[in-house]
Amino acid sequence: RRHHAQGRRTQARIMYGSYNTQKYMVNNGYNIGKFSSFVSINHDRTDGHRKNSDFWITNGFANLGYRFNDTYHLTGDVSLAKYKFQNPGETFNPIFDNKMDILRGTTSLGLENDYGQISGAIRLFYNWGNHKINDGYYSGEQPLDYLFRSTDHNLGVLFYESFRLFE
């Protein structure tokens, strides 16, 4: 996601729906000369269509870019998402306390090229996540006294070139 037009543009949205569903979004794009930026933050939530089916997420994204010339462009971005939700199970066999609490993020730094018929990039990236999950329990069972926890990290380099053979 980038802001391509010259100048600044800010947008905001608020929505409301059934089951107390709410959506909020604001973003700002800025492009002046060789510098560009785009920042966005969103929040969604709902009470869900039945008991124990609530959900919420807050996520943000930022992208900064610098165009050296018509051929080379440096870009960096970061994205974060924090979400919590609950699974109520089947209506005829509900599950209790099946809750998830997750934080995920990604960041990258890339150098892009565009020669017209040939374009591509080299990009360094890092993804991470922290997950806390309660597997829940069914009627007649005992609640779990532990959570599944997972922390992951993924680091790498991506390189690609595309060749356009026909106009």
Predicted feature locations:
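Residues on the lipid-exposed face of transmembrane beta-strands in outer-membrane beta-barrel proteins
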Residues: 26-30, 62-66, 109-113, 157-163
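Outer-membrane beta-barrel channels and translocator barrels
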Residues: 32-35, 67-71, 81, 115-118, ...
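Flexible loop and strand-edge segments within Gram-negative outer membrane beta-barrel domains
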Residues: 46-53, 57, 73-120, 126-152
